[in-house]
């Protein structure tokens, strides 16, 4: 089955695994997925990233984080913003603050994929890929 939107597929896999309280989830490997996963790890939403395989058979295994004794998921919501049919671009001043700064907007810029905070610090805008909180 072909996948026309690998970013949405990645977000859905993470969302479903965290709702079922799985410790890890596997996503198809790509440079974009790996970049998004690194931003999520840097922001504290996932615990670890492991890559398996090479080429088109590569996979990324993500370790999910939970808090409290009831294992409440660290990721409460993930929303895709810019889609293949409707791309959303924002300049530095228009970059969104998710939940007043508690969440993260993941931005694809000319200097790579980064969080909205990093993009503001560097003074660059880009395509708003998703919101995570």
UniProtKB/Swiss-Prot annotation:
PROSITE patterns: RIBOSOMAL_S8. It comes from the Bacteria. Pfam families: Ribosomal_S8. Keywords: Ribonucleoprotein, Ribosomal protein, RNA-binding, rRNA-binding. GO terms for biological process: translation. Belongs to the universal ribosomal protein uS8 family. This is Small ribosomal subunit protein uS8. It comes from Prochlorococcus marinus (strain MIT 9215). The lineage of its organism: Bacteria, Bacillati, Cyanobacteriota, Cyanophyceae, Synechococcales.
């Amino acid at each position: 089955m072909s996948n026309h939107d690998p970013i949405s597929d990645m977000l859905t896999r993470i969302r479903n695994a965290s709702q079922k309280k799985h410790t890890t989830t596997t996503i198809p490997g790509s440079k974009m997925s790996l970049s998004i996963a690194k931003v999520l790890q840097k922001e504290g939403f996932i615990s670890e990233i492991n890559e398996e395989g090479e080429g088109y058979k590569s996979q990324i295994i993500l370790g999910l984080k939970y808090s409290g004794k009831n294992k409440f998921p660290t990721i409460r919501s993930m929303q895709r913003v810019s889609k293949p049919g409707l791309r959303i671009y924002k300049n530095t001043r228009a970059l969104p603050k998710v939940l007043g700064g508690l969440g993260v907007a993941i931005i694809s810029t000319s200097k790579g994929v980064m969080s909205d905070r990093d993009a503001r610090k560097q003074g660059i805008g880009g395509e708003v890929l998703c919101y995570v909180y």
